[in-house]
Regions:
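Beta-strand-rich domains and repeat architectures in extracellular enzymes and scaffolds
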Residues: 114-145
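C-terminal capping alpha-helices of c-type cytochrome domains
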Residues: 74-101, 352, 400
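Short loop/turn segments that connect beta-strands within beta-propeller blades
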Residues: 150-154, 192-196, 236-240, 280-284, ...
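Blade-level signature of beta-propeller repeat domains, shared across WD40, Kelch, NHL, RCC1
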Residues: 385-421
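The canonical Cys-X-X-Cys-His
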Residues: 40-51, 84, 88
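Conserved beta-strand positions in repeat-built beta-propeller and related beta-rich domains
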Residues: 137-142, 178-184, 222-228, 266-272, ...
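Electrostatic cytochrome c docking/interface patches
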Residues: 21-39
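Beta-rich, blade/repeat-based domains predominating
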Residues: 121-133, 163-175, 206-219, 249-264, ...
């Protein structure tokens, strides 16, 4: 059971110094004055930017209670809990406080949502992926863990990782082993599901400190990106050999990485420049593909069954497609506009699915490839709409696995079959 947040813990944070000065030092906003302000700043700023509070869509007191319950356990301090909830409900109610409203697009397709709440509070659950036995692996980035959830039994097992790993993702190799990227300690590793033991490789390049996204070839060779370090890496787990190359253009911020359908070429997204990177897995030689819109940055990409490379234009608020054979590029504006910041993406059953993380609520969008039309849905987490989808994956059953980081949720999205529409 999670331990209650007691008064001394909050007092220790407050004793560090002026919370307002601390917020200004970190470039965080000053929240409205009132009873409860210091408690909110103390508890919230330790895990996330305070800006997320005024940037939310606003909630009732009961919704704030539910949302905070996924982050911290205040049951042992009811007076403090009431003070926090009263402050949040009074200053950030639903409706008129939403600074970033979404623009939903109605349509005929119906979805069924299955929500699974992971165990450790405040872990920032992300990047769920289905294993061969139907279980779901996920990364708890802020909890410094990866976990396995069995939808059939409801049982969860979470595996603590080496200190300061802060896993940015979890990925399964051809043997079904769960790998993680040590995003804050410069490591790549995998966990034995039976013993919980982690096998870890430290990056030999002292500047390659932030392994990000992982993929594998059919032989189990590991390929991965470094966003801040501006690098791409390869690990042979059998020999331990690691090769790391630097992207020529500074601040490209290589982010997502996936093989094409033939398994012969790697595609990498650039999160700070208008480009995609084509990578030779044998040599790690990089060829840059320029994207047309100057404000373009790309969080993630996916490869369609026909080999097309689909990507989210996070910087300009769009969806794009690259034909790798002809070089033709086409883009569409996302429904919620240029600041909608599309993020995760997956191609499924004639549609491209992605989310609009820059608006509230976070919207799940489907683009129909044949008709070039959109439909979108707010992503709900329990009785609140809160969090960001950072990666999307497909199950063997043809459903979509997504998540909401703020509420420790893995969500299975089941689209209605076309014939039933």
């Amino acid at each position: 059971m999670p331990k209650p947040l007691i008064a001394s813990a909050v007092a220790a944070v407050l004793a560090v110094g002026s919370i307002a000065a601390h917020a200004q030092t970190k470039g965080q906003p000053t929240l409205p004055d009132g009873k409860g302000k210091q408690l909110v700043e103390a508890m919230c700023s330790g895990c996330h930017a305070l800006q997320l509070i005024p940037n939310s869509s606003g909630y009732t007191r009961e919704q704030w209670r539910e949302l905070t319950s996924y982050m911290v356990n205040m049951s042992g301090s009811p007076a403090q809990q009431n003070e926090v909830l009263d402050y949040l409900a009074a200053n950030f109610p639903p409706g008129d406080t939403n600074r970033r409203p979404a623009k939903p697009v109605p349509g005929k397709l119906q979805l069924t949502w299955k929500e699974y709440v992971m165990a450790k509070l405040g872990q920032r659950t992300r990047d769920p992926i289905q294993a061969a036995d139907g279980s779901i692996w996920y990364a708890g980035q802020f909890g410094n863990l990866i976990g396995r959830y069995d939808p059939r039994t409801g049982q969860t097992r979470e595996y603590d990782l080496p200190p300061k790993s802060m896993p940015h993702t979890v990925q399964l190799d051809p043997k079904g082993r769960p790998w993680f990227s040590g995003n804050q300690n410069g490591t790549i590793g995998w966990v034995d599901p039976m013993s919980g033991k982690a096998t870890v490789w430290k990056m030999p390049d002292p500047e390659a400190t932030d392994p990000h996204t992982i993929t594998f070839d059919k032989n189990g060779i590991v390929y991965f990106t470094f966003q801040a370090a501006n690098r791409i890496g390869r690990l042979n787990p059998e020999t331990g050999e690691i090769k790391i190359v630097k992207v020529a253009e500074q601040r490209s911020q290589p982010y997502d990485i996936k093989f094409d359908k033939e398994g012969t070429t790697l595609w990498v997204s650039c999160n700070a420049r208008p480009c995609l990177l084509k990578v030779d897995p044998a040599t790690l030689a990089i060829t840059e593909v320029q994207l047309p819109r100057p404000r373009t940055t790309v969080r993630r990409l996916d490869i369609a069954p026909d080999g097309m490379v689909w990507y989210v234009n996070s910087g300009a608020g769009g969806l794009g497609r690259l034909n790798p054979k002809t070089g033709e590029i086409k883009e569409w504006d996302s429904p919620s506009g240029p600041t909608s910041h599309p993020y995760g993406i997956a191609v499924l059953d004639g549609g491209v699915w992605y989310n609009e993380s820059g608006v509230r609520p976070d919207m799940l969008v489907r683009f129909d490839i044949a008709n070039e039309t959109f439909q979108s849905w707010p992503i709900k987490s329990g009785n609140v709409y809160s969090g960001i989808l950072r990666n999307a994956r497909i199950t063997r059953e043809g459903t979509l696995l997504i998540h909401q980081t703020a509420t420790n949720r893995v969500i299975e999205v089941i689209p209605q079959k076309r014939g039933a529409m």
